[in-house]
Amino acid sequence: MKLAVVGSINIDQTVIADRIPHKGETLPGHGLSYIPGGKGANQAVAMARLGADVAMFGCVGDDDNGRKMVENLIANGVKADQVRTVKGVPTGIAIITIGDNDNTIIVVAGANSKVDRAYVDSVKEDLLGYDMVVLQHEIPLDTVHYIVDLCSEHNIPVVLNPAPAAAVPAEIIEKVTWLTPNEHEAVLIFGEDKTAEELLRMYPGKLLITQGSRGVSVGLSSEEILTVPVRPAKVVDTTGAGDTLNGAFCYRIAMGDSVEDALRYANTAASLSTEKFSAQGGMPTAEEVEKALKEL
């Protein structure tokens, strides 16, 4: 099975502190690092680490950061032939603060904003040859919706991780195979008048909601909800845990796993990813996930 990720490619500027600063507060940091990131690239790397045949579609700037990010994708086993280098704009950057088992993230889109309809049309023939397409919200939303429409027209399964949080039109929800928000994104998409449980019963086999320390839930039917609790972990850095879960879930679903098996696998992979520093640095291999599953 061939998987395609169309999404963001960033460099993450990461600062470590004792805790996340309050509004208007200045805190000393313990370290500064520049590491590969972007929700799209992260999810592609998560899949590749687990053994997936995955390609990245997106844009980087004509700068050192862009070249390094493409080299990193290739080094991790992600195909990058369709990653476009764009002159005159910087590679996307995420500014991350890590502290007290939590993080904050501010993203500057840069070249990710150039993943537009013209770019998609230029790679469409190749893109439509994949068995599953995975999307996020760090590229222009009209591009995301355009790709969902294309995949729907060609009967290609498409997974939308709607992060950062933004509204998702009802017709897009109907067309995606899976929608994977966290609990905060779910409120923005569906409103506050329905609980997560009610939403999961409304969209069985389509909606997956991550709920932080309470685990991850999915509706198996309108009558049955599966919640997989968080695996205990010695947390070092939660950055990228959601991307690891999404990447692992997509890979295992594409490989034919049941929803329950895919979710347990993905939840375990996400937990393992928090035990090392950086979004991609902690992403586990298939062997590591299988070992952890046996120990549960």
Predicted regions and their residues:
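A glycine-rich helix N-cap at a beta->alpha junction
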Residues: 75-88
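Conserved phosphate-binding/catalytic loop of the ribokinase/pfkB sugar-kinase fold
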Residues: 85-86, 96-132, 137
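Conserved phosphate-binding/catalytic region of the ribokinase-like
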Residues: 167-171, 194-296
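Conserved beta-alpha-beta core of the PfkB/ribokinase-like small-molecule kinase fold
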Residues: 132-198, 214-215
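Active-site-proximal loop->helix
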Residues: 64-78, 96, 105, 119-123, ...
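Glycine-rich phosphate/adenosyl-contacting loop at the front of the ribokinase-like
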Residues: 1-59, 64-71, 75, 279-280
